[in-house]
Amino acid sequence: MFELLVVVGIISAILAISVPMLMRARMAANEAAAIGSLRTVSSAEAGYSGAAAPGGYAILLATLATPCPGSSVGFISPDLSIDPSTRNGYIITLAPGSGVAGPDDCNGSATLTGYYSTAEPISAGRTGHRAFASTHRAVLFVDPTGVPPTNAQMAPGGGGTPLQ
């Protein structure tokens, strides 16, 4: 009986040490996936601006997923085509950024000369600690509080923290 108590105590100690490390590793993986998602959005916006709406950017993820006439492939994968998209513990959004009306795209959708994309943890402190955002300048910014940096913070001289 005593041996069983010792074994249970040892297992409990191992779990007490390993579970927090596992949670930190999972949050780090979620944050890396969120960064990857925002980079994907930035790349899709660059392709969209060059091919579908010269100088204009989509303001909805669904617009990026819509192929131009004569093509069967959109600019972003279907798993990121829902506004907002939920991936790996983060909510990915695309919204109008600072800019003015751009040209209509190949499908007749309105565009802007700027966009604002964000990745915010579903549950700050559980699914991720940091939030991320990007604009048409394609620089990712980070906020350690779990709230995405604002458009104003990401403007030149706005005081935002670029992701290193």
Spans of model-derived segments:
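Hydrophobic side chains within alpha-helical segments
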Residues: 3-6, 29, 48
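Aliphatic-rich helix starts adjacent to a transmembrane/signal segment
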Residues: 21-38
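N-terminal single-pass transmembrane signal-anchor helix
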Residues: 1-22
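Conserved alpha-helical elements of the SDR catalytic core
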Residues: 18, 25, 45
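A short acidic/small-residue loop/turn micro-motif
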Residues: 146-150
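Extracellular/periplasmic head regions of type IV pilus-like filament subunits
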Residues: 40-130, 134-139, 144, 157-164
